[in-house]
Amino acid sequence: EFYHQNGTPISAHNEEQKKQTSPYNLAYFVLNAPRDILYERIDKRVDQMLEEGLVKEVEGLKREGCHRGMVSMQGLGYKEILAYLEGEYPLEEAVRILKRDTRHFAKRQLTWFRRESDVIWVDKDKFHWDEKEILEYMLSVLKEHDILG
């Protein structure tokens, strides 16, 4: 569709856009952690979502008429729990798949960030996971780049 409207492929347009500098003065931070810790935290987060009522939430959405074919039901958590509710597999399997798919999503995000230019990686381990230290570092970078006065 883009090609038909503009006469150039979308890939050429995207390449041209990458070459342009942003009109904004910004810093692009990515908080990073060792993969084993990241995956452990993902597993705990999924467990927390379940404890806080993910299954009941999806049951309610299903009662309201939401179904598998809807884009809104394709999000992480919804599609796995919906498959469980529809008898596709037991809850334990739905949870296993949700954790696996969330880990895969996190891996894809990190891959995407690595391709970005001007990313400032913040390895949380180097700051002993101390949020105050991380914030102080980020503020110092912002001051260095004249983003903060």
Residue ranges of predicted features:
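Phosphate/pyrophosphate-binding catalytic cores of soluble transferases and nucleic-acid-acting enzymes
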Residues: E1-G149
